[in-house]
Design a protein with these regions (language model features):
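Flavin (FAD/FMN) cofactor-binding and adjacent substrate-gating region
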Residues: 73, 87-158, 163-164, 170-176
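C-terminal catalytic lobe of FAD-dependent flavoproteins
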Residues: 283-387
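Short hydrophobic core segments
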Residues: 9-11, 187-199, 337
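Conserved beta-strand-loop-beta-strand element in the redox core of flavoprotein oxidoreductases
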Residues: 169-187
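Dinucleotide-binding Rossmann-like beta1-alpha1 core, especially the glycine-rich loop
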Residues: 48-121, 242-243, 280
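Active-site substrate-recognition segment that forms the wall
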Residues: 22-25, 51, 76-83, 196-318, ...
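Glycine-rich FAD pyrophosphate-binding loop
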Residues: 25-44
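N-terminal Rossmann-like FAD-binding beta1-loop-alpha1 element of flavoenzymes
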Residues: 6-31
Length: 387
């Protein structure tokens, strides 16, 4: 285990950096820096934030399942129950079969329903437009603001520091650790945790570290008047993730669930992508979307195998990767934060992660340093992340 007095710099104030810093702060001197004036500005703060266990491959499923105890199984959960409904048009019945087979034995209460039951839950899909659906009754809307507040509070109560409008300008290697340049200030630290999302490779280059194969993907979303009371609707996702709809206050939120390759930037909504979302939703349902109330976009950053990179840069004991959460950042943040903190400290894997079968090697960034070790694109994942 590393020294208790270790000075750790976490670069990035998204949900990844916050959760990791929250678990590190009781054991080290933690400073989290964020270039923007508010936390979680670029991705987390634009999130549709659903808790679901129907997510990703087995490694991602395990960190999602492990996160339930922190997010849901508590006196005051970070959200409220909203079932998740995967809906398939008649021509995609096989895709629904495949999705059911993938999660049936893993997700408690997962239920296959017929077209009439789909219509009962989501009345804007007539029975003739659906082959059926798959319902996860234990899914939840997550309160991102409450979760961010909890992580920030844990950091500060443990003596950690959160610095806003603090731009990371690079580091210089010392005999032991780094001298980090934060705006005009030099800060000596023992360990750098790179939790910079779409900017992860820019931070790495500032430390003289080779880039990882990270790809920021832009997604646009919008709200609209559903023409009636949508409050009781589930979170509805097309089985092949071509669109999604969920209640959003007095309105409904929609998206084409697109993944448009992008550069790291303050993303803005794409008019064509918004129009595509409207077209897909209106073709699949009886909704008439005559106007858009609000629209926005954000970046979701992925590795080639769609698992985050969590671990030390091979050959370094002072540069730690925590990037590539993609659409799983919010819902996996307790498990991913605890995993990253334990690995960064050289500590034993927390019991709740071990009990869930979380395997740290599944997320080791070393898998991208050996040619041919990254796996292929996994099955479609729920569009839980706005955008």
């Amino acid at each position: 285990m590393r020294a208790m007095t270790e000075r750790i710099l976490v670069v990035g104030g998204g949900i990844a950096g916050l959760s990791c810093a929250a678990f590190l702060a009781p054991h080290a001197q933690v400073t989290l820096v964020e270039a923007e004036p508010i936390l979680t500005y670029h991705t987390t703060g634009r999130s549709a934030a659903l808790y679901t266990e129907c997510f990703g491959d087995d490694a991602l499923f395990r960190v999602a399942a492990a996160s339930r105890s922190f997010l849901v199984d508590r006196a005051e959960p970070f959200g409220k129950v909203r079932p998740l409904l995967f809906v398939a048009p008649p021509e995609d019945a096989v895709a629904l079969d495949d999705l059911e087979a993938l999660y049936r034995s893993k997700v408690p209460g997962l239920e296959r329903i017929d077209a009439e039951a789909v219509n009962a839950l989501f009345p804007v899909v007539p029975p003739q437009r659906a082959a059926g659906g798959l319902v996860e009754p234990g899914a939840m809307d997550l309160d991102v603001h409450a979760l961010v507040t909890e992580y920030a509070g844990l950091i500060r109560r443990s003596g950690g520091s959160i610095r806003m409008r603090a731009r990371f300008a690079g580091v210089r290697k010392l005999d032991s650790g780094w001298e980090a340049q934060i705006d005009d200030e030099a800060l000596e630290v023992d360990l750098v945790v790179n939790a910079s999302g779409a900017w992860g490779n820019e931070v790495a280059r500032g430390a003289g570290i080779d880039a990882l194969p990270l790809e920021p993907l832009k997604r646009s979303a919008f709200t609209f008047d559903p023409g009636g009371d949508a409050h009781g609707w589930p979170f509805v996702i097309d089985v092949l993730e071509r669109w999604y709809v969920k209640p959003e206050g007095a309105f409904a939120l929609g998206s084409a669930a697109s993944e448009i390759p992008s550069i790291p930037h303050d993303a803005r909504p794409d008019e064509i992508d918004v129009a595509l979302g409207i077209e897909r939703i209106t073709n699949a349902t009886t909704l008439e979307i005559r106007s858009v109330k609000t629209q926005w976009a954000g970046l979701r950053t992925f590795t080639p195998d769609r698992r985050p990179a969590i671990g030390f840069e091979p050959g370094s004991d002072s540069f730690f990767w925590l990037v590539g959460q993609g659409g799983a950042g919010v819902l996996t943040s307790p498990a991913v934060g605890a995993l990253a903190a334990s690995l960064a400290r050289g500590a034993r894997l927390p019991e709740f992660l071990a009990d869930a079968g979380v395997e740290p090697l599944a997320f080791d960034p070393a898998r991208f340093r050996t040619p041919g070790t990254a796996t292929s694109h996994p099955p479609a994942q729920p569009a839980i992340h706005r955008p």
